[in-house]
Design a protein with these regions (language model features):
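Charged docking surfaces used in two-component/phosphorelay signaling
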Residues: 15-23
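Active-site beta3 strand of CheY-like receiver
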Residues: 43-50
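Basic, amphipathic DNA-recognition helix from helix-turn-helix-like DNA-binding domains
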Residues: 65, 69, 74-125
Length: 125
């Protein structure tokens, strides 16, 4: 199964997402800000990233831009920012999908599976 990095400054959200994904057999890495996420990506074999936008130190948008400079992995933004402009910005900076909070955990799991399926099919994984 795939390795997934979940990055959000809300530890409860990270834990909840981790529980759902672990039940599906995924291995979870955790980060609580954008810099931490970049460090995990540089040191661990991660297949997909779920990242929040509004975080301290390095927000999800700037983190996604930096990550895209060196890593083609699928990125799903998970954010309370639900305006169309926010979604468009997230996708334009390199995210592959955008899910708004509050979210349905089962939908998030389905989107993770979909992104991993596409990524694997394209031969990048």
């Amino acid at each position: 199964m795939a390795n997934i990095l979940v990055c959000d400054d809300d530890k409860d959200i990270v834990e909840a997402i981790s529980i759902y994904l672990e039940q599906e057999g995924y291995t979870i890495f955790k980060a609580y800000d954008g810099m931490e996420a970049i460090n995990v990506l540089r040191s661990q074999p991660v297949d997909l990233l779920i990242i929040d936008i509004m975080m301290p130190k390095l927000d999800g948008i700037r983190a996604t831009l930096k990550i895209r400079e060196e890593n083609p992995l699928p990125i799903i933004i998970l954010s309370a920012k639900s305006e169309d402009a926010d979604k468009i910005l997230g996708l334009n900076v390199g995210a592959d999908d955008y899910v708004t909070k509050p979210f349905n955990p089962l939908e998030l799991v389905a989107r993770v599976k979909s992104q991993l399926r596409r990524y694997t099919r394209l031969g990048a994984a």
